[in-house]
Amino acid sequence: MSATQASSQQADSKAPADIIGQLQRAASAEEFFQLLDVAYDPNVVNVARLHILKRMGQYLAGEDLAGLPAAEATARCKAVLERAYADFVASTPLDQRVFKVLKDAVAPKSPRAPAFVSLDALK
């Protein structure tokens, strides 16, 4: 194996960590879209940026990027971001309910028993 091949193989083994590292250092949702070369409508991102990134994280949790070449790891991350973005193009953050506060807003509330204090307890 030549030094170039060894260097390339070593770079590929670090590739998933590299793209993930770049995404972790991104300072805005727009940077995610730019890093992964995903086209987006600024109006959608302005309304749902945190929701899109949270959903992307949920989708990425199901992906195994370990050991993938850089190009494939980047392509998978791109596909995941496109999928998360598409969720919010087709519907609203309220419809998707990514965050707990939105899930709890529509969760059925358990009926509470009426408060009862016996007269004996008042003595």
Swiss-Prot record:
Does Disulfide bond appear among the keywords?
no
* GO BP terms in the entry: nitrogen fixation
Q: What does this protein do?
A: May protect the nitrogenase Fe-Mo protein from oxidative damage.
Organism name: Rhodopseudomonas palustris (strain HaA2)
This protein's source sits in the domain of life called: Bacteria
Concerning InterPro entries, the annotation shows: NifW (IPR004893)
- What assembly does the database describe for this protein? Homotrimer; associates with NifD.
UniProt record similarity statement: Belongs to the NifW family.
Name-wise, this protein is Nitrogenase-stabilizing/protective protein NifW
Keywords carried by this UniProt record: Nitrogen fixation
Identify the coding gene.
Answer: nifW
- Pfam family membership, one: NifW
